[in-house]
Amino acid sequence: MNEIVDFVDEEAGSDSLFDCEYTSVDAIINQVTVFTGAKAQQTENGERCLIAYGEGYNRSAFFTDSKKLKDVVLAPNRQFPFRAIIKVVNYGTMMGFKFFAPNAPITDDKANFEAYKRTKGRGYRR
């Protein structure tokens, strides 16, 4: 008779962070947010970063391709949870996202966010 072995969950609880409704990053731009975890995940659009935020019934997650956001949350020494603000920033003619300290003032970022929303969905044009 074969020996029966107990199942061992190798990623104990880590996926429960992502067992929630997913939103767009737009939902939390310019708001102080508690980020609870992140992981790189293979999707039909290639490898993307999934970032979880919020707690309890308010928890959610979003996918991002932003290099600035991925570099922060996927850093080997990153500790979760942490509080931060995601702001829209200008990089020359391009727009992107960046983490800021939770006490950072929200000034002209509203104008950047409005410009981002107007250009969202349009491809890069030469």
PLM regions and their residue ranges:
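OB-fold ssDNA-binding interfaces and closely related basic DNA-contact patches used
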Residues: 1-56
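Short nucleic-acid-contacting surface segments enriched for D/E, G, S/T with interspersed K/R
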Residues: 26-29, 68-87
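OB-fold/S1-family single-stranded nucleic acid-binding modules
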Residues: 87-124
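Positively charged, low-complexity intrinsically disordered regions
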Residues: 60, 79, 119, 123-126
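Exposed alpha-helical structural elements
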Residues: 3, 67-68
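Eukaryotic short linear interaction motifs
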Residues: 42-43, 59, 70-71, 93-95, ...
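Short, surface-exposed, charged amphipathic helix/loop patches that serve as local interaction elements
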Residues: 46-56, 85-93, 98
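A short macromolecule-binding patch
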Residues: 58-64
